[in-house]
Amino acid sequence: MGDKTKVQVSKLKPGRYIIIDGEPCRIVNITVSSPGKHGSAKARIEAVGIFDGKVRSIVKPTSAEVDVPIIDKRVGQVIAITPDTVQIMDMETYELYDVPIETGVEDEVKDQLKEGITVEYWETLGRIQIKKVRGE
């Protein structure tokens, strides 16, 4: 999909998503501090990357706007598994996607993958990650 939108920093909450350094991240913690009598409040946002798991943090004024990814949560079926990729087919559009196992599959899901099972995957900013295995 690759879509993103702008949201004011004061509207963000833990558990929501934000784009930091071009990487979609899940917000873990937000700390707001007012610097003094004439300064504007600043928010320190700590987040974990969806695809790489790295912790990132930014400091922004609460009145600033930041990019928020639009995450498309979809269901697909595993068609084929190679040593470094998983091929999935979307259950609604029947499009095929090649997902790299290293970055595109959650660690808990890697050992459960087999051909023919149904999975939930997230698509955002042109990247795909398999999040969980659905009941068969």
From Swiss-Prot:
GO BP terms: positive regulation of translational elongation; positive regulation of translational termination
Positions of modified residues (Hypusine): K37
SUPFAM superfamilies, per the entry: Nucleic acid-binding proteins, Translation proteins SH3-like domain
MF annotations from Gene Ontology: ribosome binding; RNA binding; translation elongation factor activity; translation initiation factor activity
GO CC aspect terms: cytoplasm
UniProt entry keywords in alphabetical sequence: Cytoplasm, Hypusine, Initiation factor, Protein biosynthesis
Disulphide bridges, residue numbers: none
Compartments it resides in: Cytoplasm
InterPro entries documented for this protein: IF5A-like, IF5A-like_N, NA-bd_OB-fold, Rib_uL2_dom2, Trans_elong_IF5A_hypusine_site, Transl_elong_IF5A_arc, Transl_elong_IF5A_C, Translation_prot_SH3-like_sf
Record Gene3D superfamilies: 2.30.30.30, Nucleic acid-binding proteins
Cited NCBIfam families: eIF_5A, PRK03999.1
Role of this protein: Functions by promoting the formation of the first peptide bond.
Similarity section: Belongs to the eIF-5A family.
Full protein name: Translation initiation factor 5A
Organism: Thermococcus gammatolerans (strain DSM 15229 / JCM 11827 / EJ3)
Gene: eIF5A
